[in-house]
Amino acid sequence: MIAKDKIRVRLFSFDVKILDQSAESIVKAVQKAKAQIKGPIPLPTKIKKYTVLRSPHVNKKSREQFEMRTHKRLIDILEPTSALMDSLMKLELPAGVEVDIKQ
């Protein structure tokens, strides 16, 4: 069996609403180009926690915790065309969304 060409698009963001909007715009662009698509598949959210002292001098027991959540989505595009790649490169995504494209 011959392996088909596919492009894997991974999206990262701290804001899940912006991430879903970006994934939806990519899906619409791929469907407009009549290519097959798998996704968006939600990947596990990475949570990074930071613990800091509330006071700079005393009260070691008084601490505060902060967390950063990194949400991820995965989109597979099967058998992409050059026209599809051009439309994906011209696609305007909101600030705060990181896009990683691999073949």
UniProtKB/Swiss-Prot annotation:
Recorded family membership:
Belongs to the universal ribosomal protein uS10 family.
For this UniProt entry, what's an example GO CC term?
Answer: ribosome
Quaternary context: Part of the 30S ribosomal subunit.
The UniProt keywords, alphabetically, are:
Ribonucleoprotein, Ribosomal protein
- Asked whether the UniProt record includes Ribosomal protein among its keywords, one would answer yes
**PANTHER family referenced in this protein's UniProt entry, alphabetically:** 30S RIBOSOMAL PROTEIN S10 FAMILY MEMBER (PTHR11700)
Protein source organism: Borreliella burgdorferi (strain ATCC 35210 / DSM 4680 / CIP 102532 / B31) (Borrelia burgdorferi)
Q: Name one GO biological process term.
A: translation
Identify this protein by name.
Small ribosomal subunit protein uS10
Organism lineage reads as: Bacteria, Pseudomonadati, Spirochaetota, Spirochaetia, Spirochaetales
Which Gene Ontology terms cover its molecular function? structural constituent of ribosome; tRNA binding
The job of this chain, per UniProt, is described as: Involved in the binding of tRNA to the ribosomes.
